[in-house]
Amino acid sequence: MPDRATYHSLFDAVDRYFDLMFDSDVSRFDQVFASSAQLHGLLRDGNLRPLPAKDYKNELASGPSPKSKNAPRQQEILLVDFASPTQAVVKVRVRADTLLYLDYLSYHHIAGAWLITAKSFHVEHRYEVPTN
């Protein structure tokens, strides 16, 4: 069973993930994702979308952030499961602009920091874009 400090440091890492999903500040990307991380999710057509971390970083950098669009911020931790004091899976719900994601984040404690090494994402809900 991990100690209290381990839990707190993992929750801090999840907070960094939530911040990145909201402000898209890629200067902090390497404090959230391991360089070798892989992301996977199904597209609307049912095809699997594999995405290396470097490509995801470029996607975040190339568009406006939810924060810059004054999008609502929504985030919650649904589950934390430690395999060991250095490996955990965290299930989260997080909104990024008009998309509400359900993510499974695999974390490893690497060189003193919790980093995401794999992310499996699912679009749980698509919000309508407000028209003025």
Segments predicted by a language model, with ranges:
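Short, low-complexity N-terminal intrinsically disordered segments enriched in polar/charged residues
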Residues: M1-S35, L51-K54
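Surface-exposed, charged secondary-structure patches
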Residues: P2, S9-D12, Q38-L100
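Amphipathic, hydrophobic secondary-structure cores in small proteins
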Residues: Y17, A96, D103-L105
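Short beta-strand segments enriched in hydrophobic/aromatic residues
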Residues: F33, V94, S120-F121
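Beta-strand-connecting loop/turn residues
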Residues: S35, P85-T86, G112-A113
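Short secondary-structure capping/turn micro-motifs that flank functional sites
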Residues: A37-Q38, H125
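Short beta-strand edge/turn micro-motifs at domain boundaries
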Residues: L100-E128
